[in-house]
Amino acid sequence: MNLYASQTQYGKNEEFSLEVARGLVPGHEVLNVFGYSTSVTNAAFIPAWENTAAYVFPTVASTMVVSSSSASDTAVTVLIDGLNASYSRITESVTLDGTTDVATAQAFFRINSVITTAGNAVGTIYVKNAGGTTYAQIAIGSGKTNMSVYTVPAGYTAYLTQFDAFSSTSVTSGVYATFRALRTSSTGVNNVVLQVPFLNDYSITRPYPLIVPEKTDNQWQCKSSGAGLGIGIVVLGVLVKNYQD
């Protein structure tokens, strides 16, 4: 696809964010993480994703198996976007064979997203390791993973500018949610860099972006003070390729 040149070529101004989104700023790309959970309880902090349980990152890189809950999903292709054992970016397309496991050719250490690129699945799509642990899942009708989990690739730095969280609680229910940003270094050190209680929605735009180094695991999580809540989380920023001599 051909793109019109930047408006600055004609002596006019164009928003830097738009330039990045158009792919006209070398080494920069938009980072947009969205997660949704149908029920976040008061049991523990968990990310917003398709399972109402904690998300545990793989301990080793391994091939994954992809399947559907429906035997009729045989003409559906998904693209897995993840990282290898060196935290380098890798992608792989997999065509489903119904409920039969289809193995990836590459070993994944992290999975950042999975998106449908051909067809429309009628079942739930699962991406698991050989032991049956789910690392990504596409809900029926979504076409893409909705999980507030992301690992910064090697050779890149993430600059996060906006955090939004939404809950299904009502003002009169007495139940609130707590949002937090948990990040874990490649050496296993955990840091909570943001935590705040909220009712229906929480939003912050940072004039100075939150810097997240390469190889950092991120989980944007919520916890209910009482009954289970529907939770949506949005994180925006820019992924910048590190300068190398």
Residue ranges and their predicted role:
Residues 2-110, 117-245:
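Beta-strand-centric surfaces of beta-sandwich/beta-rich domains
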